[in-house]
């Protein structure tokens, strides 16, 4: 079975940047390269360990999404993106282009939406799909042939979540119920009450 690996760009970029915040990687020009360094290392590790046939990286588009239109306060409490991350994104995109890795960015839709659509279609076409993100929201997308890899906090490696692991972790009968559970819990990171 062929394998497709889908990466949530900004979730992994932010994780790389803040993961190295106490010992940032600074280049000879004085630029903080932690976000690019960490993201590229993550990609390299995934290519080596997962050995995918296909890889795509989904980026959130500039500007708002349809969620902002429906709920103007969506993500309104988040801090401004650090300048070091804004600097790193084009560097990362250049690297992905050089590697021949597909990048996907759809106006008005978050990377989560894009990855969900691609994962569903690819699984339907018989591919094994691995979604790579620290974002727990993706657990609702797990199904047969679609799993999730979550980078571990403070440790190396990943937590692999398939259908059974999602059911056990979230105490649900079906991964589709994760969306209901998270909706009831609210989400402070996205400013959802």
What are the functions of these language-model segments?
Residues 1-56, 60, 66-73:
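Non-catalytic, usually N-terminal nucleic-acid engagement modules in DNA/RNA processing proteins
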Residues 22-26, 76-193:
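Extended two-metal-dependent nuclease catalytic cores across DNA- and RNA-processing enzymes
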Residues 65-67, 139-140:
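Short catalytic/ligand-binding loop motif for oxyanion handling, primarily in non-cytosolic enzymes
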